[in-house]
């Protein structure tokens, strides 16, 4: 039986240039080569199971074909003909043999290069559940949630009617789908879409108290139908504060508040999900939740200001150590500057 052919994203980009540009900078393009994934895969008991979502074409055409290193490439999502939801994971069917590309546009004219397939599924959340719905089932004990964003969307009470993953993560704009094609009013972006920082609202004030500056306020999730941070357990949102002098020198820092989900082993130590027995803690921010916080800094000189920073880190220090990789540098989501005159704490 002949092996189905898969085409590189670069070939698709000859007609779909804007899509190629957006996808090339996305997490989907990095799925098979991110340092965190490669370290996880090296320790996982079943590396082929990891490839199912990080290099899906490998299961169909074999790792020898270089196109598999493109991760979640064009040929993956647009060859999905069916997604089946299971209790612990979802499965999908890739249809490569006919060179038919599935998508939500149902009046497309077939070009010379490939056939087209009308697929309402491609505008709905179950498509994303193919990889964003996963529970680890240990040898003993209940299933451990790993990727739960689909389940949180599915069972959430804050989701606007009709909102699917694509509504935030693949926002629409006016564009020609292919070079020379008609301009359409609702064409989905193919980058990462909504970012973590877009879903978080931060309000704060600084008051002078007997122990120094009290930084207090609220952080809330706005518009997202799932908890934040999303994705791999061990991903962290960090909220911290620096006291900065008039010349820009950091005088002192408050310890970060960490929002994350941590999975643990039999000894209660944080561990990669494939060795986890249970959830050790879950301090993620819930949809439409408004959570208060408090940080303290020493009393400030007259010309100093407070820099409140909201960061995202791909992995906790404990998991980085367990995986023997360098701790990823945090990404800045938001920065707020609080300045004198300070109010008085009650």
Language model: regions and residue ranges:
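Short, conserved sequence motifs used for protein processing/export or organelle targeting and
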Residues: 62, 136, 154-346
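Sequence context of c-type cytochrome heme-c attachment sites
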Residues: 1-123, 127-159
């Amino acid at each position: 039986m002949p092996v189905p052919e898969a085409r590189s994203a670069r070939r698709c980009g000859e007609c779909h240039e804007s899509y190629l540009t957006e996808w090339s900078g996305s997490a989907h393009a990095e799925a098979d080569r991110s340092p965190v994934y490669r370290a996880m895969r090296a320790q996982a008991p079943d590396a082929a199971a990891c490839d199912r979502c990080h290099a899906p074409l490998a299961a169909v055409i074999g790792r020898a074909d270089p196109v598999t290193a493109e991760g979640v490439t064009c040929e993956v999502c647009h060859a999905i003909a069916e997604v089946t939801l299971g209790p612990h994971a979802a499965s999908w069917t890739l249809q490569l043999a006919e060179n038919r590309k599935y998508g939500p546009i149902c009046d497309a004219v077939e070009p010379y290069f490939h056939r087209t397939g009308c697929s309402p599924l491609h505008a709905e959340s179950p498509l994303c559940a193919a990889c964003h719905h996963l529970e680890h089932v240990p040898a003993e004990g209940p299933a451990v949630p790993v990727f739960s964003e689909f389940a949180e969307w599915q069972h959430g009470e804050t989701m606007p009617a009709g909102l699917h993953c694509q509504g935030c993560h693949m926002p629409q704009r006016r564009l020609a789908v292919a070079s020379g094609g008609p301009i359409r009013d609702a064409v989905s972006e193919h980058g990462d879409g909504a970012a973590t920082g877009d879903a978080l609202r931060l309000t704060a004030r600084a008051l002078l108290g007997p122990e120094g500056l009290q930084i207090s306020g609220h952080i809330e999730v706005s518009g997202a139908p799932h908890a934040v941070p999303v994705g791999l357990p061990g991903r962290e949102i960090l909220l911290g504060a620096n006291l900065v002098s008039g010349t820009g020198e950091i005088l002192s820092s408050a310890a970060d508040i960490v929002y994350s989900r941590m999975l643990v082993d039999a000894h209660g130590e944080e561990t990669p999900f494939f060795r986890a027995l249970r959830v050790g803690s879950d301090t993620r921010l819930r949809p439409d939740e408004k959570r208060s916080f408090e940080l303290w800094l020493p009393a400030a000189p007259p010309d100093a200001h407070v820099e409140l920073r909201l960061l995202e880190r791909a992995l906790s220090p404990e998991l980085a150590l367990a995986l023997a990789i360098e701790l990823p540098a945090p990404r800045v989501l938001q920065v707020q500057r609080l300045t004198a005159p300070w109010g008085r704490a009650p």
